[in-house]
């Protein structure tokens, strides 16, 4: 109890205060801190400045006597240039629709994004380190207006994404957008640079033949009912009438189903009251009646 009281005393009279201007913008943040109970609280001030339209243009914390961050904006509103004492200078250009098209980080690495002219969906990401070669790091392909893709609910969705790890492919989606079947193929060369330049037909040799497939089933609300991973292990979930998790099970490939969560009880406010695990360990939660804040957790297990 003595240690607990000393911990409480160290936090006494150390509030965090926020000060706003007449536009509701946070212009000051005051934090008070002490290490030992005998120390006077140290005041730490963060100062923010805004332009006429309410955009943050500079921020200064308690470490320095100058700005930590400075921001410049174009007419579109997204930050055009950011200067930071820790992360250097970065810039980002957007198109008329607000989508990023080119960026430059503090290391001199340039990045570009190419979009479809009509729908604005991303088609490719390109990257060029300072003094290095320009490469295509990502390519995106979308479901076509075909009977096959409509049946799998992937019409117009991103179904193949070539990235720096290989190929991520979506085979079918639920009505709520949850991936029902997806697969991953990894690169054959994991050490060399990744460049998805050219036509898709020429990339097959860069990928390993093995595909890691994940399959799911969902309910009408889009919540997972079962999920089978690439190793063949299956998770199963159950829900109550309110859509809250009521139990879960795990089946290791070629094994028997095991109980992970045996039961769950909730309050009328949706807060977890009691959870019994598959090994019969019970965890109970208590909440303050007035504020509904968590005030206690008790875990018990049966005697061996």
Which stretches of residues belong to each language-model region?
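Beta-strand elements of repeat-based all-beta scaffolds
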Residues: 1-304
């Amino acid at each position: 109890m003595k240690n607990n009281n000393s911990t409480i005393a160290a936090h006494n009279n150390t509030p965090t205060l926020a000060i706003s201007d007449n536009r509701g913008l946070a212009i000051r943040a005051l934090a008070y801190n002490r290490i030992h109970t005998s120390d006077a609280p140290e005041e730490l001030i963060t100062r923010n400045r805004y332009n006429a339209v309410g955009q943050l243009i500079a921020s200064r914390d308690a470490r320095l006597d100058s700005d930590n961050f400075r921001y410049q904006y174009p007419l579109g509103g997204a930050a055009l240039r950011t200067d930071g004492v820790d992360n250097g200078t970065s810039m980002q250009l957007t198109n008329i629709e607000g989508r990023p098209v080119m960026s430059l980080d503090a290391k001199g690495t340039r990045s570009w994004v190419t979009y479809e002219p009509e729908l604005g969906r991303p088609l490719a990401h390109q990257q060029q380190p300072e003094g290095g070669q320009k490469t295509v790091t990502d390519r995106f392909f979308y479901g076509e207006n075909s009977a096959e893709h409509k049946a799998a609910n992937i019409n117009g969705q991103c179904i193949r994404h070539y990235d720096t790890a290989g190929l991520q492919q979506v085979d079918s989606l639920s009505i709520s957008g949850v991936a029902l079947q997806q697969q991953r193929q990894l690169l054959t060369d994991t050490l060399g640079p990744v460049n998805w330049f050219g036509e898709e037909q020429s990339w097959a040799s860069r990928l390993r033949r093995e595909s890691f497939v994940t399959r799911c089933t969902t309910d009408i609300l889009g919540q997972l009912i079962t999920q089978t991973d690439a190793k063949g292990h299956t998770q199963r979930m159950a829900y109550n009438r309110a859509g809250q998790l009521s139990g879960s099970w795990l089946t290791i490939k070629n094994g028997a189903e095991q109980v992970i969560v045996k039961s769950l009880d909730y309050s009328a406010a949706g807060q977890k009251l009691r959870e019994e695990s598959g090994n019969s360990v019970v965890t109970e939660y208590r909440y303050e009646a007035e504020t509904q804040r968590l005030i206690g957790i008790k875990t018990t297990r049966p005697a061996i």
